[in-house]
């Protein structure tokens, strides 16, 4: 039997999941996306060449791997085919390697218009959404008025359903947000044209994954645990469940089939958009982390906020997702610092707590409690052998393991796939 491994971002997203999934996929037969949409931005660097994927699983770069988009993903067909076109131009036979669940909810241009109109209307209270229609699409899915990929199998019915849904969207856009309506007829024709190309890619992902019982399968999470709609810093969250449990319901694979849950976390913390961030450094340290770590969002181009590693937030993610091990990324970004801090607890209303509280208001009231470490002041960039790490860097990693109570099994020391220390083989 193959191993079924779930890869979850343990912070506020942007932890480096794409590189790690790409690396692990060398020993896998399939990779599955199970939540989110094209608001994800997974950056891969292979042999010095950079590829950014937003919707298609990171396993698409491997010729021996099937890539699946599960039912928990919300699908923008325009974004999908832009990505397919770009990858095909690079010589990657995407249509041979990719299959998509018919149960995926469809993102329409009117979802995107609503998303952007709502964010504009919020003004200074904006959430920080990517403006790509993710939230409004999930909203329609839950309200059972949304369209699914399988609806394209019946063009006449699809036309009627889309007409009704977009009429509702346009009413909101014009009468509540005072924005321009989206052209319904043009959108219907565009989406029906996409339908002809997407039909061959449709497959029941639940059944398809049963064919991979003897192979390793990677379940690729998007965003991060602290952006979970239920367990994250609500309302400054994404619109899907990002914890490990969503790998099951978002792909149709039973939870007993999942063997190992890997947390991805940077050696420090970043966040894009609005919301509380107790260990944020709005100073020279934050500037240094942003510059050296090249902290710019792959999906939006927005600069990320930066701060020290936040263990109470990681503990919240650990409780939600039952991580078996940790992959620590961007260790090399800390190389030049004289001292390095870890937020080990919060002070909340004069009480010391070691797990991040639920919701944004309580988290905003927390003050970080730090433990300070002497920096190693030696380059770790590109190191592949743990023995070559400076002792102070190893002490830093050991302290993270001690606080979390689980092992750091992978250490990333650079963007390239080869810049990795594998302390434990996760896939045989």
UniProtKB/Swiss-Prot annotation:
InterPro entries in the cross-refs: Adenylosuccin_syn_GTP-bd (IPR018220), Adenylosuccin_syn_Lys_AS (IPR033128), Adenylosuccinate_synth_dom1 (IPR042109), Adenylosuccinate_synth_dom2 (IPR042110), Adenylosuccinate_synth_dom3 (IPR042111), Adenylosuccinate_synthetase (IPR001114), P-loop_NTPase (IPR027417)
Chain sites annotated for binding GTP: 13-19, 41-43, 304, 330-332, 412-414
Catalytic site positions: 14, 42
Residue numbers binding Mg(2+): 14, 41
Note describing how the cofactor binds: Binds 1 Mg(2+) ion per subunit.
Binding site for substrate: 298-304
Pathway, per record: Purine metabolism; AMP biosynthesis via de novo pathway; AMP from IMP: step 1/2
SUPFAM superfamilies with a match to the protein in the record: P-loop containing nucleoside triphosphate hydrolases (SSF52540)
Claim: Iron is one of the keywords in the record: no
Compartments in which it is found: Cytoplasm
Subunit structure: Homodimer.
Purpose of the protein: Plays an important role in the de novo pathway of purine nucleotide biosynthesis. Catalyzes the first committed step in the biosynthesis of AMP from IMP.
Name used for this protein in its record: Adenylosuccinate synthetase
Protein species of origin: Dichelobacter nodosus (strain VCS1703A)
Gene: purA
